[in-house]
Design a protein with these regions (language model features):
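A common structural junction motif
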Residues: 627-635
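Conserved catalytic core of nucleic-acid polymerases
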Residues: 257-260, 427-597, 639, 643-653
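A short acidic-Thr-Gly-centered motif at the start of a beta-strand
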Residues: 1, 61-65, 369-385, 592-596
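Short, conserved charged micro-motifs
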Residues: 616-623
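Conserved "right-hand" nucleotidyltransferase catalytic core of DNA-directed polymerases
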Residues: 1-13, 24-27, 31-34, 42-43, ...
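Conserved catalytic palm subdomain of right-hand nucleotidyl-transferase polymerases, strongest
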Residues: 2-3, 74, 95-98, 378-394
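Active-site palm subdomain of RNA-directed nucleic acid polymerases
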Residues: 184-196, 586-609
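Conserved RNase H-like, two-metal-ion catalytic cores of nucleic-acid enzymes
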Residues: 1-110, 118, 344, 400
Length: 653
């Protein structure tokens, strides 16, 4: 049964997410459109919840609650969550299939309109473009005016013609979703992926606890402190708006400090100058403090948390559609500040007590402290502690495994420091972290992080944030790393050649460790060792007049612009996608193993999982780490290791 609903809530869906959205006292379902797959597309039924046909409603509810009937929706998490709240009955994800996730697995846009257009659906099957205005009118509160009689909500009787359009729009969404599903049905989703999505939905439904009293204190103090800093900057500079770059640059020039651009990096550079005038130093320090946008994550926590102080829906399944990794939603847990404070627990204790004066004295400007405390706002359930376990250097391990770089695999098997071992292979001398040739370890580290996916000098610069390696040595480091890793270099070439071959000859090309390239209906597929496939939609070779070479291009969502369009790829990039996809599949198997032991995974970030564990369960860390390090049947010879720790709040060990 295909389902689409239209809803009302005074809570902003985009800001708060669906779980807080349905907790609004005025939340309601307005329209329900549904169809059974044997009805034919002209037979979509629409229930107007203001004037519902009892027989139709009974038919819908009976099917909805029948575990034998599979329900489909585009972004099924929304329909599941709303219908569960509305009917006060559970909506097990095992009974649902998400058409949006299906689209994402094929590299298509994750929105109904975008997916329909990318698939070239005919106009009568596309999403109705009038929808946004109708949602604004009926599904959100309206501003009270004299004209509308000071009402705060539009009902069907306020504009019957618009209401009829809304019903048509709701019906059309089912038509579009069903047509997308029909078009994509030839591409089979592995059952293991459906099971993983169900686990993901249970995890999002359960959520993670937040220390809301602490978050409230931080937001309240930070608002006040930002105002104080703003006023101090105005007083020091005499500027009306010290946030204005143009005004600030003029003022800096008047102080004898020329800065062509005022960015995070240029300010850091300027603050290193011992001769910088004190007044300028203070103004730049204030600007840096005011630029700490990470504090906004606390405000999101306040908007998005549920009544039980849990945050739900923070992970999007298959959100990174090149690799299939999860993406962060609401509070972006994938880009949190590192923990560098000398005593994180003390800083957190001071925040919980609201003693920000002592915090400032001990740790400096609070904006910087707050950015490091974001992780600590996530707390275990009552009577529990967190066990955090992550894969140690998972991408380096997977890359070496698929390439067959034996010396790297052996180093991991023996538990050696991979940065020291890499530097040793590059420079042909022993390298120890705190001993012989230790100065070379940094070169090894930056090279491991920068060079694995065909990265050159540019990638080295991005990874060497501290500028530890002189610029004139960067190319030599790249060359040394490539010389030490011939199997990885060969893998880049093999992947690019495999992609070109399947595009031109429409045949399967197999590489080692179960990786295979194929070409179906104009799309490039890469089969992974797990059996899952990566998809590059509408892949072809395209001549670039700038270099006279044919490049591999496909249609995809641009990571910067978020627009659907042509994207180029090459050997190293394909290797990156494959490596990260295999790392994701390793995490997925470990999550399923941990869940099978009865443990409650509350969230996961990159390659680590955070598990809510009862305090009396003293063996949990050992058992969870063992799950992470256990061999995977489809990856024989891949050395995995789980590193973990226990903590009373989330943190980076």
């Amino acid at each position: 049964m295909g389902v689409d609903i239209e809803t009302y809530s005074s809570v902003d869906l985009a800001e708060a997410g669906v779980y807080a959205y349905v907790e609004a006292p005025d939340f309601d379902i307005l329209l329900i459109s549904y169809i059974f797959d044997d009805w034919g597309e002209d037979n979509v039924k629409t229930i107007d919840c203001f004037d519902a046909d009892p027989d139709m409603m009974a038919e819908f509810c009976e099917a909805l609650l029948d575990p034998q009937i599979v329900k489909t929706a585009f972004n099924a998490n929304f329909e599941r969550t709303c219908l569960a709240k509305w009917l006060q009955k559970p909506m097990p994800p095992e009974e649902w299939r998400c058409t949006m996730v299906k689209a994402l697995t094929l590299g298509l846009p994750g929105n109904l309109a975008g997916a329909g257009e990318a698939l070239g659906l005919p106009p009568e099957k596309l999403k109705d473009p009038q929808g946004k205005a109708l949602i604004q009118f009926f599904s959100k509160p309206c501003k009270p005016t004299r004209t509308n009689g000071q009402r705060t909500r539009n009902l069907p009787q306020h504009d019957p013609a618009k209401w009829q359009l809304y019903k048509s729009y709701n019906r059309q969404d089912v038509v579009t979703e069903q047509e997308i599903l029909r078009k994509l049905s030839i591409y089979k989703t592995p059952e293991s992926e459906q099971e993983l999505w169900a686990l993901d939905q249970h995890m999002n439904d359960n959520g993670v606890a937040l220390d809301i009293p602490m978050v409230e204190k931080i937001v309240e103090y930070d608002t006040r402190r930002r105002q104080e800093l703003q006023e101090e900057a105005q007083e020091l500079t005499g500027l009306k708006n010290p946030n204005s770059l143009a005004q600030l640059k003029r003022w800096l020039a008047e102080q004898g400090v020329e800065m062509t651009s005022v960015t995070k990096d240029t300010i850091t550079e300027a603050l290193r100058d011992p001769d910088l005038p004190d007044i300028v130093r203070r103004v730049l320090e204030i600007r840096t403090a005011l630029g700490k946008t990470s504090v906004a994550k606390y405000s999101t926590m306040l908007v998005a948390h549920c009544q039980d102080h849990r945050l739900r829906g923070i992970l999007q399944f298959y959100g990174a559609n090149r690799s299939g990794r999860w993406a962060g939603r609401l509070v972006q847990t994938h880009n949190l500040a590192k923990n560098t404070l000398p005593d994180l627990a003390l800083a957190r204790e001071l925040a919980a007590e609201g003693d920000f004066e002592t915090m400032g004295t001990l740790f400096g400007e609070t904006a910087f402290v707050f950015s490091e405390l974001i992780r600590t706002a996530f707390i275990p359930s009552e009577g529990c502690r967190f066990v955090v376990s992550d894969f140690s250097a998972i991408e380096a391990r997977v890359l070496a495994w698929i390439a067959g770089e034996e010396w790297t695999l052996e180093a991991f098997r023996q538990g050696k420091d991979i940065y020291c071992e890499t530097a040793s292979m590059m420079y042909h001398v022993p390298v120890e972290k705190h001993g012989a040739n230790s100065h070379l370890r940094q070169k090894g580290k930056v090279a491991v992080l920068a060079c694995g996916y065909q990265g050159g000098v540019g990638a080295m610069k991005r990874m060497d944030k501290g500028g530890a390696i002189p610029e004139d040595e960067l190319q030599s480091v790249v060359d040394q790393w490539r010389g030490a890793n011939p199997s990885v270099v060969k893998l880049w070439r093999n992947c690019e050649m495999a992609a070109r071959t399947v595009i031109e000859e429409h045949r399967t090309v197999r590489l080692k460790n179960g990786i295979a390239f194929g070409y179906i209906n104009g799309n490039l597929f890469i089969k992974l060792p797990s059996g899952r496939k990566l998809c590059y939609w509408n892949t072809h070779l395209k001549m670039d007049p700038r270099d006279g070479r044919e490049h591999i291009v496909y249609m995809g969502v641009n990571q910067e612009t978020k627009q659907w369009g042509e994207t180029e790829t090459y050997g190293g990039k394909l290797v990156e996608n494959i490596t990260q996809a295999i790392a994701r599949d390793c995490l997925a198997i470990s999550m399923q193993r941990v869940a099978a032991l009865g443990y409650n995974i509350v969230m996961h970030v990159h390659d680590e999982m955070i598990v809510d564990v009862p305090i009396e369960d003293t063996d949990a860390l050992e058992r969870i780490n063992a799950c992470m390090g256990e061999a995977i049947p489809w990856a024989p010879g891949l050395p995995l290791r789980g590193d973990g720790y226990e903590t009373p709040f989330y943190m980076k060990d």
